[in-house]
Amino acid sequence: CLNRGLGAVPEGAFADPRHEALGWRAYREDPQGEDRTDWDALRIALGVPETGTELTPDSFILEMGFERLNGVDFKKGCYVGQEVTARMKHKTELRKGLARVEGEAPLTEGAEIVSGGKAAGTVLSVAGTTALAYLRFDRTEAGLEAEGQSLSFERLD
């Protein structure tokens, strides 16, 4: 059973390596204590993707911000996907990737994001008026809209 919390790291737990504000994690047979933190809202605010939500089998780890989240090390030896990841890092600029978007009202997961009448991305996870989205960065200059509202965005690569 996964236990999570904020504050001092208890014995047998470890600090979440993705972001210091995510606190600690511990895997135990029985849950200990009750933490009422809204973990989805916290990870969305911090721009941390979740497996099965933002991270799919088709995801490229650099597009999902893994370098920023301590999820890839370019000094380490061999790892699965190393060639593609290294090529993306050193030979090109990311054209697509994870972004935090902010609307005027709550968004709907799966909503299409458009810019200048062209598809520019998709809303992936929502917490209030903040969401994680997958965007084509080359289509963001004309401004972003989803569900009839303007969006601001921040790249998370």
Outline where the language-model segments fall.
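Glycine-rich, small/acidic residue-mixed loop/short-helix segments
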Residues: M64-V72, A86-D157
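Acidic, low-complexity central loop/insert segments
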Residues: C1-P49, S115, A146
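A mid-sequence, solvent-exposed acidic-amphipathic segment
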Residues: D38-H90, L94-R95
